[in-house]
Amino acid sequence: MSVLFSIKDDFRYDIVRKIFEGGMAVVYEAEQHGAKQFVKRVAIKVIRQSFADQQMFIDNFIGEAKLVADLIHTNIVQTYQFGELNGIYYIVMEYINGVNLEQFAQQMGDKNKKLPSELAVFIASRVCRGLAYAHNKTDKNGKLLGLVHRDVSFKNIM
């Protein structure tokens, strides 16, 4: 048997800190450890404990993981892995260092500054590029997936 068929899911994650709490999940910054002191910074989205036994929320979380798995675009956070451990589902994603748009707007407001219009247009254009890519995404047979982002908000834009 080739080595490729022998590789097992042997990732180890160490939680560094909580990044964000949403309605359905909590996102943590973590370190993924591999062979020879390999370390990669990742984000891990974990279904909230209060929803971990509610099938509707579990199904929604699994559905989200499946939908975003093949979205590969510079303006969309990459998904690396989906898993389950002791009945708790999680999604391992690209870690984006920095603040979200809500935090950035607050920082600007705290300094009595306004977001320059050129920067606002740039941010909006990048958000639109990511949304357009997702909206036009097709399956392997060329059929539109019909993806719609249901939570476009300042806190979900990095």
Where are these regions (language model features)?
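Activation-segment/catalytic-loop signature of the eukaryotic protein kinase fold
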Residues: 82
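Activation segment signature within eukaryotic-like protein kinase domains
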Residues: 123-124
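Conserved short submotifs of the Hanks-type protein kinase catalytic core
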Residues: 86-100, 104
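Glycine-rich ATP phosphate-binding loop
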Residues: 28-31, 37-48
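Protein kinase glycine-rich loop
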Residues: 16-23, 27
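AlphaC helix of the protein kinase catalytic domain
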Residues: 101-115
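Protein kinase catalytic-loop region centered on the HRD/HxD motif
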Residues: 128-147
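AlphaC helix of the eukaryotic protein kinase fold
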Residues: 48-70
